[in-house]
Amino acid sequence: QAASWTLKEEVTFNTTEINSTDWIKYPILKFSEVPEVEVAIINRPSKDVKGAGEVPVPPTAAAIANAIYNASGFRINDLPITPEKILNA
């Protein structure tokens, strides 16, 4: 979800309304585009159980943007980070 927000998802508008009104028009990562994720479960029975679903969302955009900067020297400061934005940086 966080990678999709960072790399693709964007609501588009024309002069009077939202263009991306359905899943066909709204860009989202496909399963074939999602990188493999390694999950590590830490056994800590003395600690309370916590949810982990939304924890990786905030740092994902920063991590991807910093990886692009480290590889290219270009900072991208607005989402989504698209190939066009990188080429025009």
Residue spans for each PLM region:
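C-terminal catalytic domains of large/alpha subunits in multi-subunit enzymes
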Residues: 1-89
